[in-house]
Amino acid sequence: MLEVVGLVKRYGDVLALDGCSVNVPSGHLVGLLGPNGAGKTTVMRTLFGLVVPDAGTVRWSGRSVDVRSRQRFGYMPEERGLYPAMRGAEQIAYFGRLGGLSAGDAAAAARRWMQRLGLAGREDSRVDRLSHGNQQRVQLAVALVHDPDLLVLDEPFAGLDPIAVDVLAALLHELCEAGTTVLFSSHQLDLVQDLCEDVAILDHGRVVLAGRLSELRAGALRRRLEVTLGRDAGERWWERWSEALPGVLVAGGDGRSVRLTVDRSVDLEKVLIEARSTAEVVRFDFDPPSLSEIFREAVRS
């Protein structure tokens, strides 16, 4: 397990991390979310000693992270850090050597990951002559070449086409099933919702919400509800609901259906009774809020 405990980091008058704490269970795929400037990249850099916190600790498997443990980490930074004049396979193998592999093992692993990531035939291509998407695949191979126990990816899906997104998502799931722990940041919340079991949301340098996504959605303060009647009930037939049903807000509708957001405290049976008093109800769909809605609520509050 990765444990980030009470990290504090100041840059002059700017408080980048304000007691940030987050746990990443072993073998889990965790999305680290937050608006721009929330502190996501700073957290990731502290894991690798690129940023030294003013306070707080980082532990891996119960021990403070040091140079030796970092050799078992893989990192894909937001600012891609490739050597443009090096050939793809040569570059990946070079980082494999830095990760502790022998020359032969590093070269073999480089070829294997290039094949796996759709870069077969480009082993001898200079990095600066590859497309943006293929450069990103080389950067991912650099992070994976030494088979790390912890994989940290800063905006790995940025700039990828839909097919490449699907390939990377499937790979991350496969890695986690094999026991790799993965922490990644992304602004693509729909993708994170489909991909992750766990999320942590940062704002102003601290974690404002974290946990199992299914539990966060089930326990959210507001939920979505759509009600459809069997006949047209006229314009704005739902207007009285805001008075009769405290905690119910109308998001929109027409003569036959209405979309609502309801507080967690609202008794849904009362909503159904109110709808049936208007006309026959043919649809009564309840959905927990999306990750995007949870994110906005957490950051606003």
At which residue positions do the language-model features occur?
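ABC transporter nucleotide-binding domains
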Residues: L2-V4, K9-D203, L209
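Short, flexible helix/strand-to-coil boundary loops that buttress conserved ligand/catalytic motifs
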Residues: S69, A220, F295-A298
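C-terminal coupling/interaction segments
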Residues: D263-S301
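Structural motif
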Residues: F48, R80, L245-P246, A279
